[in-house]
A protein has these predicted regions:
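Radical SAM/AdoMet-radical enzyme domain recognition
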Residues: 1-115, 128-136
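Polar/charged alpha-helical tracts
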Residues: 7-11, 53, 60, 90, ...
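Generic preference for hydrophobic/aromatic residues in regular secondary structure cores
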Residues: 26, 65, 105, 111-122, ...
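Charged, low-complexity, helix-prone segments enriched in Lys/Glu/Asp/Gln
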Residues: 29-31, 70, 156, 160, ...
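Active-site rim elements
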Residues: 38-44, 68-72, 141-148, 181, ...
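Flexible glycine/acidic-rich beta-alpha junction loops that bind and position SAM and/or redox cofactors
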Residues: 73-79, 96-161, 175, 179-188
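Radical SAM enzyme core and accessory elements
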Residues: 165-253
Length: 253
């Protein structure tokens, strides 16, 4: 249904017609592969603080809405993965069942409906999960494939998996909607298992060399500083750099 609200809707636009709820649910998908400066490095133009502010505003000012964070899991996602998971937990508390109110919707009948005795079916809005996550594994470009990860980076993922397990949903989940669901934990378990399978050593060397070349060119073109943003990857970067140095030395001899 529509109605005119000249005080609160499009006050200065000249168009005051407001369309009331015409859908049962709206699902907003957000691509976010990390947090803070690392997330901004991976997606040029992203303002992380503004994104989170807008996300909270969207959740606070709308009903019948859900947000799903998509972390296209690549090697650059690893350092901030635990912080990313903590962000999910925090939002699930902030907008979870403890802060939701169940209510009944009974649309007002039109004059025509009143005349013909037509009654709308009442709808009862129950509490529901508003924050979802997904962590699909990136396979291309090859140099960002997490299967190129070193044992140190793999250990970081293992630590994050334990973090998820220690924050798994509890018996009151249907009331609070807090914690991680079993299938969400299985997603990271699956990713970790695939990453541990590894790749052919020659392919890993090629991918790491291309990683070094790509990052250097990326920083040059966009005036960024990889090691300042990803200090946790200093060792990995230097391993990749060593491959380039060997090639350069071979050319000189």
């Amino acid at each position: 249904r529509t109605y005119e609200d000249t005080e609160n809707f499009n006050k200065f636009s000249g168009n005051h017609w407001y369309v009331d709820k015409g859908f049962k649910h709206f699902w907003l998908y957000i691509s976010l592969d990390g947090v803070g400066q690392q997330a901004e490095y991976m997606r040029t133009g992203l303002d992380y603080a503004r994104l989170m502010s807008n996300t909270r505003k969207f959740l606070a000012e709308t009903k019948y809405t859900t947000v799903s964070f998509i972390n296209t899991f690549n090697i650059l996602s690893i350092p901030s993965l635990k912080s990313w998971l903590q962000m999910i937990l925090d939002l699930r508390v902030e907008f979870g069942g403890r802060n939701q109110t169940e209510f009944e919707i009974a649309p007002e009948p039109t004059e025509h409906e009143k005349e013909h005795g037509i009654e709308h079916k009442k709808y009862f809005q129950k509490k529901f999960q508003r924050i979802f996550l997904d962590i699909p594994l990136l396979k291309y470009p090859n140099w960002f494939d997490p299967q190129n990860a070193t044992p140190t980076l793999i250990a970081t993922i293992e630590d994050c998996l334990e973090f998820m397990r220690s924050n798994a949903q509890q018996e009151d989940y249907r009331e609070t909607f807090e914690g991680f669901k079993p299938h969400e934990i299985l997603k990271l378990e699956r990713n970790l298992a695939i990453i541990k399978e590894g790749k052919d050593p020659a392919a890993v060397q090629t991918n790491r060399l291309q990683f070094y070349q790509y990052i250097n060119e990326y920083d040059r073109r966009r005036d960024t500083a990889f090691l300042e943003v990803f200090p946790e990857m200093n060792s990995y970067y230097n391993e990749c750099k060593l491959l380039q140095m060997r090639i350069d030395d071979a050319k000189e001899t």
